[in-house]
Regions:
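N-terminal helicase ATP-binding lobe
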Residues: 1-264
Length: 264
C-alpha cells in the first residue's frame, strides 16, 4: 500500500492525515500522537469526534434519567429527538398521539434543570399548564425551580411570580402561548430549551416564531439574515450575484450558529 497524505480529511480536526491512519480508522497524528485500539473517546481532548463522544454520553445520561422518570426505556424515535437536541438542532416532533412527544419534552426540561439550564414549556391551555407542572414535580423537579401562571393566582401571588419572571428566578417556565403574547417583554432571553406543545395553535398568533427565536438568544438582525437567505434560495432562477449573496449569508449563519451554540 502506497502511503499517501490526504489534505483536510482528518475526521476530527479537518487537518491532513495519512492513508495508514485512515485505513486503521484513526485520526491524524496531531489529534492522537500515539495509535490506540481502544475507544477514541477515552483519548481525544478536542475536535468533532470528541464532540460526538460528549453527545453520546449526554444522550445515555438522559436515557437513564428518562427511564427513572417514566419507568421504561425511551422509544428509538425519542432517542433520535434527543440526538437532534444535543446536536443543537431545532426541529418539529411529527408523530401520532401517544408516541411520547410530551414525555420527551418534559423529561428533557427536567434533565436540563438538574444541570442548571433553563427551559420554557409553552402550552395551548391553562389546564395543560397545571398538568405539565404536576408531571414535572413527579419527575423530581423542585417546586422553587418551576414558575407557572394560572387564572387562580391572587393579585399578590401573581405579582410575586412576575417579579420572579423578570429576575429569571426559575429553571423551568411553563405558560400558555397567550401569556407569551401578552408578557413577551418581561420574559428573559437565553433559554437553553424551548418546547412548544401543540405547535399548530402556537402558529396561529403572528410573530410567535420570531419571539421564540428571540427568547433563544437570536436577534432581529439574525432572523432577517436567515429570511433573506431563504428568499434567495427559493428563487427558481438564480444569478451569479444571487449565489454570491447566498454564500455570504450562509457563512454569516454559520458564524451565528457557532456564537449561539451550546456546549453540554
Amino acid at each position: 500500500l502506497i502511503k499517501s497524505i490526504f489534505k483536510n480529511l482528518c475526521p476530527n480536526c479537518g487537518g491532513d492525515i495519512s492513508s495508514e491512519r485512515l485505513y486503521k480508522g484513526l485520526v491524524c497524528e496531531k489529534c492522537l500522537p500515539i495509535e490506540v485500539v481502544e475507544d477514541l473517546c477515552d483519548e481525544l481532548k478536542y475536535g468533532r469526534i470528541r464532540l460526538l463522544c460528549d453527545i453520546r454520553k449526554e444522550i445515555d445520561n438522559w436515557r437513564k434519567f428518562f427511564k427513572k422518570c417514566v419507568g421504561s426505556e425511551p422509544w428509538s424515535l425519542q432517542l433520535t429527538w434527543a440526538m437532534r437536541f444535543f446536536l443543537d438542532r431545532s426541529f418539529a416532533l411529527l408523530a401520532p398521539t401517544g408516541v411520547g412527544k410530551t414525555s420527551f419534552g418534559l423529561s428533557l426540561a427536567a434533565y436540563l434543570a438538574q444541570k442548571g439550564k433553563k427551559s420554557y414549556v409553552i402550552l395551548p391551555t391553562r389546564l395543560l399548564v397545571y398538568q405539565t407542572v404536576k408531571k414535572l414535580y413527579g419527575f423530581g423537579v423542585a417546586e422553587d425551580k418551576i414558575l407557572f401562571f394560572g387564572e387562580e393566582d391572587r393579585k399578590e401571588e401573581r405579582e410575586a411570580k412576575l417579579n420572579r419572571l423578570r429576575n429569571g428566578d426559575f429553571l423551568i417556565l411553563a405558560t400558555t402561548s397567550m401569556f407569551l403574547y401578552k408578557h413577551y417583554q418581561e420574559i428573559p432571553r437565553g433559554f437553553d430549551f424551548l418546547f412548544v406543545d401543540d405547535v399548530d395553535s402556537f402558529l396561529k398568533t403572528a410573530r410567535n416564531i420570531d419571539k421564540a427565536l428571540l427568547l433563544l438568544g437570536f436577534s432581529e438582525s439574525d432572523i432577517s439574515i436567515a429570511l433573506e437567505a431563504i428568499r434567495l434560495q427559493s428563487k427558481l432562477y438564480k444569478t451569479e450575484e444571487d449565489w454570491n449573496k447566498i454564500n455570504a449569508l450562509t457563512e454569516k449563519l454559520r458564524e451565528l450558529r457557532r456564537k449561539n451554540g451550546r456546549a453540554f
